[in-house]
């Protein structure tokens, strides 16, 4: 595969990436879902400006860059990166798959993503944002991945086939190379999210034989060695619904944001990482508030109103973690991400 073209000189990019993080934070979101465009703004929604054509934006931790999905020639699914301030976008990956799975390293220098053909196995790759160099970490069928707090390791879930429910387990691997370490052997573990207090939250799909349409999701915790596995949540999940997926941790690990999903349903749920107590952030309904991120201080949830249906009216908003009235940050917008 040819190396991606660099539209900005490497030295300029290096200087930009070396800038100190500003006091403010960056917000990004999508407008016009049928001809999607990506915007960047301050974290209060001010100063919004278009930065590219595409969707599913993800702001880098330092707030300087935004990665997003761009549809290229012949419907090619491209991972592009652009400076939040604006400028030409760079294509880092062609054949990007499952664009809702993307992870920035904590230092904003590396992106983890999936690539492959439209059908079949995927490759989990680490991409150097500055050079575009790629390294394959694993192959298979993946259900989520995240970096360790210091960025030295990656945790991911992988199954050997597309069979549903997936026979998936969680693995840990060094970002500098080496053999992956298998952390679970239950064949029903997926979507690991590495937290800041030496624990990983992940999904176990359980009670598949008891339920009419397949298993439900519950959240579990374990340490980075795969030990101390503990069930965190006990959730009522109707037959056509799936249950909880982890979304984001607060910086001190005291608060956890999750999403309750299922047929025509997606809404934000707060979870106590110690007790497992859970509460819908707003209303538990089909067209509820979709949560996409939690601020580092754990006080504010970012998301959008109107549910997941692209035909609905959406507004990007923030909501206090304890609940309350949403503050609209961007009207007629969805899929928000921020560095706050």
Protein language model annotation of sequence segments:
Residues 1-10:
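Bacterial N-terminal signal peptides that target proteins for export
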Residues 21-340:
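Sequence signature of WD/YWTD-type beta-propeller architectures
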Residues 9-18:
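Bacterial N-terminal signal peptides
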